[in-house]
């Protein structure tokens, strides 16, 4: 489903470009996770109970995300996942959804969570506009950074996975690094 359309007179999406040439829509699920984010770390909440932290992005680039995980060492299940972000509504919604996905039904194991892809997050949200795909990539990267941090802290260095680019769109052959670089260079769409 396309979430971008040419603006028609009298029809307005959730967001419209300054020139009025394009607008895009967010699903009700995206709106719910933006307006009512799940597992958001409020204020200066104590983070000592967490045994893993992940960070990605930079405020200078417009998006920064930090996640905290509490992993049960006996089962390696993610039993708690909290987060803070400096970013747009799509980044907030994507991270909120990811936090639900990794903790629901008793939590994913670290190996299961590492297999989570940006597409999985976007599917659960009901889609994102093309110009917002990178937001699901950000939360995916922060999650994987936290998993590596857990392995560092628990001296399981052989389980740390060096991050390489990951294929986001197999048809267009677009990787997460392609999207990040394009956004940093000012791109607004993948086209």
Regions found by a protein language model. Give the residues of each.
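Intrinsic disorder at enzyme termini
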Residues: 2-9, 18, 146-167, 184
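Extended low-complexity intrinsically disordered regions
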Residues: 5-49
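Structured beta-strand/loop patches that form or line metal/cofactor-binding pockets in enzymes
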Residues: 36-78
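Flexible, glycine/charged-enriched surface loops at secondary-structure junctions
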Residues: 42-44, 110, 131, 153-159
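Active-site- and interface-proximal helix/loop "cap" or "latch" segments in soluble metabolic
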Residues: 60-62, 70-137, 190
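Stable alpha-helical structural segments in soluble proteins, enriched in small hydrophobic residues
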Residues: 101, 138-153
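Compact, charge-rich alpha-helical regulatory domains located at protein termini
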Residues: 163-169, 173-191
């Amino acid at each position: 489903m396309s979430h971008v359309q040419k603006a028609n007179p009298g029809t307005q999406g959730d967001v419209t470009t300054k020139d009025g040439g394009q607008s895009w829509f967010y699903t009700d699920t995206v709106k719910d996770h933006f307006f009512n984010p799940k597992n958001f770390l409020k204020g200066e909440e104590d983070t000592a109970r967490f045994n893993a932290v992940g960070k990605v992005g930079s405020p200078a680039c417009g998006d920064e995300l930090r996640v905290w995980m509490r992993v049960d060492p006996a089962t390696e299940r993610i039993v708690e996942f909290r987060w803070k972000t400096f970013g747009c509504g799509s980044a907030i919604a994507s991270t909120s959804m990811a936090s639900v996905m990794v903790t629901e039904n008793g939590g994913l194991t670290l190996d299961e969570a590492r297999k989570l892809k940006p597409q999985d997050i976007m599917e659960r949200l009901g889609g994102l506009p093309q110009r917002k795909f990178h937001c699901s990539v950000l939360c995916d990267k922060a999650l994987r950074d936290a998993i590596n941090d857990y392995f560092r802290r628990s001296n399981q260095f052989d389980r740390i996975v060096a991050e390489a680019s990951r294929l986001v769109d197999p048809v267009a052959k677009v990787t997460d690094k392609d999207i990040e670089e394009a956004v940093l260079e000012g791109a607004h769409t993948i086209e």
